[in-house]
Amino acid sequence: MRSDTREEISAALDAYHASLSRVLDLKCDALTTPELLACLQRLEVERRRQGAAEHALINQLAGQACEEELGGTLRTALANRLHITPGEASRRIAEAEDLGERRALTGEPLPAQLTATAAAQREGKIGREHIKEIQAFFKELSAAVDLGIREAAEAQLAELATSRRPDHLHGLATQLMDWLHPDGNFSDQERARKRGITMGKQEFDGMSRISGLLTPELRATIEAVLAKLAAPGACNPDDQTPLVADTPDADAVRRDTRSQAQRNHDAFLAALRGLLASGELGQHKGLPVTIVVSTTLKELEAATGKGVTGGGSRVPMSDLIRMASHANHYLALFDGAKPLALYHTKRLASPAQRIMLYAKDRGCSRPGCDAPAYHSEVHHVTPWTTTHRTDINDLTLACGPDNRLVEKGWKTRKNAHGDTEWLPPPHLDHGQPRINRYHHPAKILCEQDDDEPH
């Protein structure tokens, strides 16, 4: 495998940048409709080829760079440096693993795992969505299918993809799967591998989508719970006292105008609310497992606005007031910008300090990290071994991986505003922000307003 010099690599990227800049400056008024479509097709080819060019870089990083050099996992490093989502970073890493060249333990080069697919991408004949369909096919294909058949199937799908849209390729891949593996994957191991539930991002109206695949055991469990709690008349939020333990009478059933989907939702809420109130979940990161919400005294008194949970979600004040009647949740109030001056001489933060950090930081304070407070630990900005105090004004939240970065060259400090600054080691410092504003979008917007001329 040929190795290029730093100068050759830099020169090639400079030429690529210059060529693209020339294309960006083109004025296409003189082109006819067929010519415009032809130009778009040529640009699409180059867009696809660029993805292939990234594979070698990503695979080399995966093979040679440790987390200390990267400042975290490869997924996190790519997301932060390239300003892409962690999900997109994972997709690129997985694509590079499947389509990029590999090396054996002895150092000799090996072809890509999906050889035909990699070649088609390199020629610009297939794009990201085609590759996604082919990867999904092999993710579902049983390991019992021998190597020769797998290679032939991959070559056929890659060839089919070069002349079809991804959505058309999907139907062909489904038919091929039926021929190669007609009985499907019904083993316990396959079901365990596929299980999962995903809660989507919170939308503008506060609602969140949920999706996933349930094992037969979980489905059977949910069926039993819903048979009771999602029955007509049960757990009806419109009732003054919703029925949970008792069986709804005819009048309760008649009053219930909810759909089955709405009754399912309310049943899950009642079941999880009861579990939280039971106290049987023990503790999580120094606090009883419960809902922690932060808001301002002004918003609470006005019964308007939104609180922010330890998980990073937004809760309307009307919901927050109603939630307070069901369980012993924690509510952290701010009458001003700074939390209470809580401190003590023990190394571990007290429950009260944790609550205030949940409210103040809302999540990991390292720039670029989106871990919410529920998934973060208390970090001493000034090492405890130096001060022997655990002062609320010298504490912050950091997720586990970021907390450990302080042992690998990172430093933390408080600025004049009480915000935590993260200072990377020199080899990772590319001028990135020192403060994490991800959990405080309102501050970002206010800072932009302040920067604009008046």
Curated annotation (Swiss-Prot):
The organism named in the record is Mycobacterium tuberculosis (strain CDC 1551 / Oshkosh)
GO MF term set: endonuclease activity; nucleic acid binding; zinc ion binding
Question: Which Pfam families does the record cross-reference, listed alphabetically?
Answer: DUF222, HNH
**The HNH domain covers which part of the protein?**
364-405
> What pairs make up the disulfide bonds?
none
Q: What is stated as this protein's family in its record?
A: Belongs to the Rv1128c/1148c/1588c/1702c/1945/3466 family.
Protein known as: Uncharacterized protein MT1183
> InterPro entries, per this entry?
DUF222, HNH, HNH_nuc
